[in-house]
C-alpha cells in the first residue's frame, strides 16, 4: 500500500479520513478539496485529532462518489494525493451496490468463445494482458469488467492490469483454474464439465492425513496415484491431503530446494505446480490430480482437501489486494489483522469474499469430484459463511464431509459469530477436532512431561469414559496431526524411564482409542509406524529428510502397522452404536456396546477379567482372533482387547 505525506481515504459514503504526516507543514491545514478532472468540491472538516506522528482529519462528503473514477484530494500549497477507496468497501451500502450473484467470474470457454470477467468495483480501468498485448476490458453491472474473444484460448496465459487507488497493478486471476509455475500468470482452462458423483455414506469414517510431497520420493500427484496400495491395504477410507492449491515457500522449478507443507496460500482455485510431473505442461497438473482422485475412488476411499481460507500468506502482494484493496481482509487499527500468526485474516462475512470461497469449493467438488474439506483454523471464519458452504455443497453431494479446527481464536472480527467450538451447535453439518480427546489420552500437547490416560495417568479414566458413551458425530478423535510433535515423540518425552517396547505398546493403545471412541477417527501419516521427527514441534518447513515418509524404515514397526490394519478391519466389520456403557474399574476401561466389550488396560500389570458366561475373543491385544473363552480372560499389560458376548 502506497503511503504519501498526505493520505486520503474514503471510509464511508459520507466520510473521508485524512492522515497527514507532521513533516508536511507541521501536519496542519485548514482546507481540503475533492478533485476530479477539472471539477473541484470544497470539503468540510468534521473533526481533528493530533497524534504523535500524524494529524488525522475527518471530512464530511456531501456529493455522490462515482466508483468508476479516480479522485484526488487537494490541500495546502496545492498538494494533490489520490483518494483511496478504503473502508468504504466494507460498508453494507457497498455490499448492496456491488454484490455480483452470477457464477461466471474468471474465464468461461464455451461454443468456441472465451470470456474473461473480473470483479473490480473500485478500479477505474482494467486491461487483459495476453502475450504482452493489452486489451481494455468493459465495465459492466456490479463492478464486473469483461471481454470476450471469438476463439477458444485454452492453454493461453494471461494477467490483469488493474488501475485502482492511483496505482496500476499487474496480477493473476483469483478465479484462475491454473497458474504458471510460481504464480506468474494464469492459464485459460475449460472447466465447464461437472465430474461430481454421489457416493454412499461411509458408516465409520477413518481419515488419513498425508502430504502429497511426503508420500513419495517424486512428490507428485502421479507418484501418489501409482503408490496407493499402501493406503488401500491399511484400510482407511478417507484420504485427507494437506494443501494442494497454489502456495508460496516452494519454487515450482526447484521444488526440492525448500520444503513447505502449503499453509502459505497464494492462489486458491489452482493447484501447486511443484506436484506436476510435467512442469512444462501447465495444464497437465489438473489431469494428474483428477487421475489421483479417480484412483482413490476406485480403491473405495474418499478424498478430502485441507483448505486454508482463514489467512493469506502475503496479503499486500496478493491478487485480492491488487484488485480490490482493503476489501478481502480484516483490518485492525488501520493495518491487516494477523491474530493467527500466519498471515492476514480473510473478512469472510463480506459477501464477495464469502462468495469467492463458496465458488472455490463448488469448483473442486464438481470439477475434481472432491468428497469433503478440512478447514484450517476454522475458528477465524464466520458461522454464516460456513453454513452457506454446507448448504451449497450438500446440493451437489448430500454426504459431503466437512470438518475443521474449531479453536477459539482471538480475532479482529467482533460483529458476527465465528466457527469455533463454542458455536458448534450452530453448525450441525461440521465436525470439530477434539483437543480434549487428544489431551485426555495422550497428555497435554504443550506440556511435554504431562501424561494422559494411556501414557501413565490412570486417574484420568473417569474423564476418558465420556469419549466412549456419548453421541460424538461432531467430533474428530485424534492424538496426532501435522501440527506439533508426533505422538511417538510425545510418548518418549512423557515416559522417559520406560523401554522402547513400552513406548510402542502405548502408541498402539492410542491408535485403538482413536479408532474405537465414538466420533470420527483421524490418523496422521506415519502414526501407524511410530514416526519420530526428533521431538520437533513444527515441521512445516523442516526438510524432505525429516518429513518424507519414504525415508522411514516401516519394517521396524511392522507390528504396529499390522495392529492398526487389524483394528481398522474390525471397526468396519462390527456394528457399534451410540449407546455404549463405559465404566472405570480402578484404571481399566470397560466399554459395552451391542454385545461387544472393549477393554483398555493401560497399566503395567496384567488383569484378570472374570465373567459368568462364554465370550468370543475378537482381538487379543495384538491381532485379530476368533476363539471362545469361559469364565475369565487375562488382559495383558498395556493392551486393548475386544470380546463378544455369545448368546
Residue ranges, per PLM feature:
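Substrate-binding/active-site clefts of carbohydrate-active enzymes
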Residues: 211-222, 226-368, 378-381, 386-397
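C-terminal beta-strand-rich structural cap/linker in extracellular carbohydrate-active enzymes
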Residues: 154-156, 626-647
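Glycan-recognition and catalytic regions of carbohydrate-active enzymes
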Residues: 519-537, 542-596, 603
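Short, surface-exposed alpha-helix to beta-strand junction/turn motifs within ectodomains of secreted
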Residues: 23-43, 124-132
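The feature marks proteins involved in alpha-glucan
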Residues: 2-7, 52-115, 134-209, 216
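Conserved alpha/beta catalytic core and glycan-binding cleft of carbohydrate-active enzymes
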Residues: 176-182, 390-538, 575, 584-585, ...
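Carbohydrate-binding surface patches
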Residues: 110-124, 581-612
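Conserved, mostly hydrophobic/aromatic
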Residues: 118, 210, 241, 296, ...
